[in-house]
Amino acid sequence: MRFLGAALLLYFPASAEVIGFENAAPGKLPSGWTVAMTHDGAPPRWEIVRDLSAPSPPYVLAQVSRDSTAGRFPLAIWDATTIRDGEVSVAFKAVEGSVDQAAGIVWRYRDQNNYYIVRANALENNVVLYKVENGVRLTIAPKGLPSRSYGVNHAIPRRQWNTLRVAFNGGSFIVFFNGEQLFEASDRTFAEAGKTGLWTKADSLTYFDEFTVSGK
């Protein structure tokens, strides 16, 4: 398992595109991003907010609409890059949320109803990988666990900055939290290149910074 993970990581070039928000205008959606949403609920509102504790202060990107609809999944899609195989990471801080406190990374995004997503949840204290296919969110179990397994349990500290990362090559995925490899998984539903982006759920107020993309 460790050998496979190392081989997958070595496949990718060292250069990466790092998208920070330190120079963005507060209260607005930064350029280069498109807002979308899976399922129902109030429209997402992604905007720049101030956080001096951020990795690249003073500004971060947040989804600030607090609709508590449980099946509401706001998306912010980075339009500049389309990749099939590579890595995506983001720094995040789970700030508030009574229904959820979630932060997710999207890759091989086709549209708001078809993409892969891995998310960390500070209320459930777990990390789970899904595919959203035709609007239906389905769990992809970690390798070595039963097919209906729901990700892995792991402490997700609230109100402090953490890093979520996923590496993907073909149908193989590796998920990391704060630099620690958590699990591997596999799926071949979406094989073509797609966009990458950010994801939250329901009333999550989550801050994001240093969104990083590499691959081809």
List the predicted regions and their residue ranges.
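Sec-dependent N-terminal signal peptides
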Residues: 3-13
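Intrinsic-disorder/low-complexity, polar/charged segments enriched in Ser/Thr/Lys/Arg/Asp/Glu/Gln
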Residues: 16-20, 85-89, 161-163
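Extracellular carbohydrate-recognition regions
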Residues: 16-39, 209
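Ligand-recognition surfaces built from glycine- and aromatic
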Residues: 19-20, 190-216
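Secretory/extracellular carbohydrate-interaction modules
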Residues: 26, 63-137
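Extracellular glycan-recognition surfaces and repeat-rich motifs
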Residues: 28-62, 71
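Short, aromatic/His-centered strand-loop micro-motif at the edge of beta-sheets
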Residues: 135-165
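Short, solvent-exposed beta-strand-to-loop segments that form ligand-recognition rims
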Residues: 171-197
